[in-house]
Curated annotation (Swiss-Prot):
Cross-referenced InterPro entries: Cyt_c-552/4, Cytochrome_c-554-like, Multihaem_cyt_sf
Membrane-crossing residue ranges in chain numbering: none
Assigned keywords, A-Z: Electron transport, Heme, Iron, Metal-binding, Periplasm, Signal, Transport
GO MF annotations in UniProt: metal ion binding
UniProt protein name: Cytochrome c-554
Superkingdom of origin: Bacteria
Length: 235
């Protein structure tokens, strides 16, 4: 997938979104180490994605042609640019999120919390739900996690980076805008329903055990589960 690595993020736009939005906006980020302690297989496959390597493109003399097309300076270190960093890390400008002054490896790259929401408020309940299912088969309503800020839909979070340009069809777009637009290069055209299925962008999908039930459920949940790999429990 020709991922658009976007400069010009208004970082707050990422986290005032969808169900559980007010709680998610206030929740601290924790970093993907917490998520990957259980979701090891997903975390391992994520490491090979463009999202995992998002910060690399901000380094000097990397993606030189793309930067020149967008009228950026290829020799500049954009890892220090507050208008760029937010679309290449988790939680920039948010509680517990990535900072330029003290960058944390577990928040570097577009990881778990950029899509699923900042985890502090829901992670404990998420883990307890898994434990309850293993013990007694008890299922947990997804709405309980959504109320705590877990995002089951993702589209707005993706749009906040991939569609944040002048003239964007996304209504949330606002300055500072990304310079990487479809007008600069057609590869920056972003259609969520297509891109979310791009295997080079996302971690592998594995069979879920059925811990959660009900709405809100991601619109491609059943489709992804139909072709998901066998679960790698405890790996």
């Amino acid at each position: 997938m020709k991922i658009m690595i976007a400069c010009g993020l208004v970082a707050a736009a990422l986290f005032t979104l969808t169900s559980g939005q007010s709680l998610a906006a206030d929740a601290p980020f924790e970093g993907r180490k917490k998520c990957s302690s259980c979701h090891k297989a997903q975390a391992q496959s994520w490491k090979d994605t463009a999202h995992a390597k998002a910060m690399e493109s901000l380094k000097p003399n990397v993606k030189k042609e793309a930067k020149q097309k967008a009228k950026l300076d290829p020799a500049k270190d954009y890892t220090q640019d507050k208008d760029c960093v937010g679309c290449h890390v988790d939680g920039f400008g948010q509680k517990g999120g990535y900072t330029i002054e003290s960058p944390k490896p577990m928040l570097t790259g577009v990881g778990c919390e950029s899509c699923h929401g900042p985890g502090r408020n829901f992670r404990g309940d998420h883990r307890k739900s898994g434990q309850a299912f293993e013990k007694s088969g008890k299922k947990t309503p997804r709405k309980d996690l959504a109320k705590k800020g877990q995002d089951f839909h993702f589209e707005e979070r993706c749009s906040a980076c991939h569609l944040n340009y002048e003239g964007s069809p996304w209504k949330g777009a606002k300055a500072p805008y990304t310079p990487f637009t479809p007008e600069v290069d057609a590869k920056y055209t972003f259609k969520f329903d297509e891109m979310v299925k791009e295997v080079k962008a996302m971690h592998e999908h594995y069979k879920l055990e059925g811990v959660f039930e009900g709405e809100p459920k991601f619109k491609f949940h059943d489709e992804f589960q139909a072709s998901a790999k066998p679960a790698k429990k405890g790996k």
